[in-house]
Amino acid sequence: MFNTLKILDLPENERPRERLIKYGSQALSNSELIAIILGTGGRNENVLSLSSRILKQCEGLNGLLTLTPEEIMTLKGIGSAKAAKIIAVGELAKRFKAYKSGDVYIIKSPGDVAGLVMEEMKYFKEEHLRVIMLNTKNIVISCKDVSIGSLNSAIVHPREVFCEALKKNSASIVICHNHPSGDPTPSSEDINVTKRLKQCGIILGINLLDHLIIGHSNYISLKEKNIL
């Protein structure tokens, strides 16, 4: 018979929860924090050992938190419940870093746009087109993904891009999309779609300020490249 080993099975001075309360979260390693999230180990493996192993398999925290639920569940000792906990923590971390609730986020440069979306979008495995809506003072009103898949004029329709902006009474928008390859160099289709959306924005009275292409470690602003 197999046993699922719990945190309480560990000596008290090795239990991550007790160590967190006594010494603070900063004193804990990534594997100890993951152990608290998981709560229990696997078959004949305590939760600290499980956490250390999956972090090693994923080459660290970034690798683990960018996996899909299906990919996480291929790891030995991780079922749907544990996978859901890991995915939830990763999503909360991305949302907290990207845009804190209640904050006023002002777009003054392409770097400001990258700071808002890059941490999340650089890990997407499919292309996402995101619209950032701004008021007259360039304060972010809302963000919305309007397309998932290849960015081309046949798929990306101005109606989807500008519909939400009109509802929000946006003065202007910035669009962003990621290249799963990691190379943010714009394709000819990227440029054509951008120019088409720019013209539609002029007609609707909503200025397209910039289009950022997000790579794994950098981004390209079509405005800075004088393409827009």
Curated annotation (Swiss-Prot):
Pfam families: RadC, UPF0758_N. InterPro entries: MPN, RadC_JAB, RuvA_2-like, UPF0758, UPF0758_CS, UPF0758_N. Zn(2+) binds at residues 177, 179, 190. Transmembrane segments: none annotated. One of its GO terms (molecular function) is metal ion binding. GO terms for biological process: proteolysis. It comes from the Bacteria. A motif (JAMM motif) lies at residues 177-190. Belongs to the UPF0758 family. Residues 106-228 form the MPN domain. Keywords: Hydrolase, Metal-binding, Metalloprotease, Protease, Zinc. This is UPF0758 protein NT01CX_1687.
